[in-house]
């Protein structure tokens, strides 16, 4: 009998990464660098079975993500199946490929919520970052169409050194589009963002200015009765304590990749840990019994100084993927923490950001050709 079941809660949030296909080339994409090697995708029926198992375990929220989930022709069918099972459903999209007829189909299928991402507040920078000259106008048109259909609408802007100084214009755009919520999420350095970190990490001064801009707008909007919610997420590279990543490893979040690998966070597949496939094991068995999902649960795995730290119940030892990327071992204390013996790695990144002169055009953009080239080079 599995003794861990009574103490491990079910995954409340399921993220379905339906595909790695995407019409954009954002240099901060969280998809794996080797996505070009991974062409397989779960079928409609296989995804619906994943939803059924997750719902039976107690999952309540389902996000459709990618890549770009709109590239899946069966998306309305998947939305309907999820809604019939009782999920609250959220479409996380770039808006590229979205049409008014698709919005109507999604509404009829029962979609609850839509999040549209922008790269910048102006067409020129948006095009440079997305690798698509028509993207900005398409996003504007679809954001207005989403709002016209009374969807709760979130606009998402990934902030970095090349767009963070236009934060006031970004917020003004969100107000104009009547967003319900605005995610001003400073770049999290995983996947392609980690590859481009030196050219993306804002300086400490940029972060401080951005925090003040957000504070000023919150005050101004509250005074005018504007109910748009501004969520500003700072990079933990400028913190002294790590984030409680995903609310704790294998605690509330479960992600399934396009080909069916189950993960406790978006980036965990890069770790030297075996994660099972939903095609080979049930979700229940994966969540409660698999080595991968139990590897960093609780506190027994922790090294010092985490093991004896009085803050471990807040941050759960920090991010395992970040520890792996920066130190070579996921077992190490997250270098973000000032108590970590590897904190100098974060200090080095801050110094690099302070003197970086990398232009947008010099970033490595997320596309199939670049993905193939990276791994051809690494395999030599």
Swiss-Prot record:
Domain named Radical SAM core: residues: 8-223
Intrachain S-S bonds: none
Organism: Klebsiella pneumoniae subsp. pneumoniae (strain ATCC 700721 / MGH 78578)
Cofactor(s) essential for the protein: [4Fe-4S] cluster
Keyword field contains S-adenosyl-L-methionine: yes
SUPFAM superfamilies attached to this UniProt entry: Radical SAM enzymes (SSF102114)
Catalytic activity of the protein: [PQQ precursor protein] + S-adenosyl-L-methionine = E-Y cross-linked-[PQQ precursor protein] + 5'-deoxyadenosine + L-methionine + H(+)
Cofactor: binding details: Binds 1 [4Fe-4S] cluster. The cluster is coordinated with 3 cysteines and an exchangeable S-adenosyl-L-methionine.
Chain's role: Catalyzes the cross-linking of a glutamate residue and a tyrosine residue in the PqqA protein as part of the biosynthesis of pyrroloquinoline quinone (PQQ).
Enzyme class: oxidoreductase
Keywords assigned by UniProt, alphabetized: 4Fe-4S, Iron, Iron-sulfur, Metal-binding, Oxidoreductase, PQQ biosynthesis, S-adenosyl-L-methionine
Domain of life: Bacteria
Positions of [4Fe-4S] cluster binding: 22, 26, 29
GO molecular function, one term: oxidoreductase activity
Subunit structure: Interacts with PqqD. The interaction is necessary for activity of PqqE.
Stretches assigned to coiled coil: none
Gene3D superfamilies in alphabetical order: Aldolase class I (3.20.20.70)
EC number: 1.21.98.4
GO biological process: pyrroloquinoline quinone biosynthetic process
Pathway: Cofactor biosynthesis; pyrroloquinoline quinone biosynthesis
Name this polypeptide is given: PqqA peptide cyclase
Matching InterPro entries: 4Fe4S-binding_SPASM_dom (IPR023885), Aldolase_TIM (IPR013785), Elp3/MiaA/NifB-like_rSAM (IPR006638), MoaA_NifB_PqqE_Fe-S-bd_CS (IPR000385), PQQ_synth_PqqE_bac (IPR011843), PqqE-like (IPR017200), Radical_SAM_PqqE_MftC-like (IPR050377), rSAM (IPR007197)
Record family assignment: Belongs to the radical SAM superfamily. PqqE family.
Gene: pqqE
């Amino acid at each position: 009998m599995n003794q861990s079941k009574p103490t491990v809660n079910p995954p409340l949030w399921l993220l379905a990464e339906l595909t790695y296909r995407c019409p954009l080339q954002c240099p901060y994409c969280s998809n794996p660098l080797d996505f070009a090697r991974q062409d397989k995708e779960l079928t409609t029926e296989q995804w619906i079975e994943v939803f059924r198992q997750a719902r039976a375990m107690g999952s309540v929220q389902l996000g459709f993500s990618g890549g770009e989930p709109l590239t899946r022709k069966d998306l309305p069918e998947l939305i309907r199946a999820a809604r019939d099972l009782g999920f609250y459903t959220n479409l996380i999209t770039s808006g590229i490929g979205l049409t008014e007829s698709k919005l109507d189909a999604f509404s009829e299928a029962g979609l609850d919520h839509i999040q549209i991402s922008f790269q910048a507040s102006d067409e020129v920078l948006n095009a440079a970052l997305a690798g698509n000259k028509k993207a900005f106008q398409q996003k504007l048109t679809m954001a207005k169409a989403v709002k016209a259909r009374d969807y709760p609408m979130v606009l998402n802007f990934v902030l970095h050194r090349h767009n963070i100084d236009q934060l006031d214009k970004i917020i003004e755009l969100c107000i104009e589009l009547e967003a319900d919520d605005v995610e001003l999420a400073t770049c999290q350095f995983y996947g392609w963002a980690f590859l481009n970190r030196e050219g993306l990490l804002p300086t400490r001064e940029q972060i401080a200015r951005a925090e003040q801009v957000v504070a000023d707008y919150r005050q101004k909007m509250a005074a005018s009765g504007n109910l748009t919610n501004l969520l500003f997420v700072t990079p933990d590279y400028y913190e002294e304590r790590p984030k409680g990543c995903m609310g704790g490893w294998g605690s509330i979040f479960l992600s399934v990749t396009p080909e069916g690998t189950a993960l406790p966070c978006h980036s965990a597949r890069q770790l030297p840990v075996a994660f099972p496939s939903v095609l080979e094991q049930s979700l229940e068995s994966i969540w409660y019994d698999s080595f991968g999902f139990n590897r960093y649960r609780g506190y027994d795995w922790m090294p010092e100084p985490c093991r004896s730290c009085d803050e471990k119940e807040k941050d759960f030892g920090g991010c395992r993927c970040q520890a792996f990327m920066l130190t070579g071992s996921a077992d190490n204390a997250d270098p973000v923490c000032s108590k970590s013996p590897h904190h100098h790695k974060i200090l080095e990144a801050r110094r690099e950001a302070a003197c970086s002169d990398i232009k947008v055009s010099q970033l490595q953009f997320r596309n199939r050709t670049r993905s193939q080239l990276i791994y051809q080079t690494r395999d030599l």
